[in-house]
């Protein structure tokens, strides 16, 4: 990071590094401390630029390489049937690269995001994560689920026996007896009795006069 007042970084090959693998090294003036990496390596394309991307639907991408000089800009345009979401023009502000990410293209008829999120590698050893696209439309609710399995039977209760009830009131006396019953039939003749005992001897007779 170049701090204001720390002196102008030295020019290297006219301020640009056009050969892949070439490294630019910065040092701070006396009394200042370097913040961030002191070396920037030119990898592919322009130093700090974004790669060319053309998905065939959204936008044409970059025509050529990203300008390497501070103050230069890149402008995007969408194809017929699409319109851009985000900044159409990106301007290089410092040696790190273009600010923000490329704009997305939205289909006029389908209202869906065409561009995908992408990760670009910065030439200073860090990774820039571009923002993801807008959220899509909610999906339709799924079918209603079937009934669940029957639950397990509950455990038996543990209540104690109830208190005995109080005695009931005395009942009323019953009515008097009913009508007299009919006369019973005659009984059977009993068996013959046994032989009687001999009688006592008679008294002596009296003499006649």
UniProtKB/Swiss-Prot annotation:
| Compositionally biased spans, kind Gly residues | 142-162
Q: Quick one: a GO biological-process term for this protein?
A: extracellular matrix organization
- Tell me which domain of life the UniProt entry assigns to the organism this sequence originates from: Eukaryota
Q: Which positions make up the signal peptide?
A: none
Q: Where is this region: Triple-helical region?
A: 130-209
Q: Where is this region: Nonhelical region?
A: 1-129
Cellular component terms, GO, for this chain's entry? collagen trimer; extracellular matrix; extracellular space
Which Gene Ontology molecular-function terms are recorded? extracellular matrix structural constituent conferring tensile strength
Span list, region Disordered: 138-209
Q: Which InterPro entries match?
A: Collagen_superfamily (IPR050149)
Keyword Repeat assigned: yes
The alphabetical list of record keywords is:
Collagen, Repeat
Task of the protein: Major component of the egg case wall which is secreted by the oviduct. The egg case combines mechanical strength and toughness with high permeability to small molecules and ions.
UniProt name for this protein? Egg case collagen
Q: Lineage of the native species?
A: Eukaryota, Metazoa, Chordata, Craniata, Vertebrata
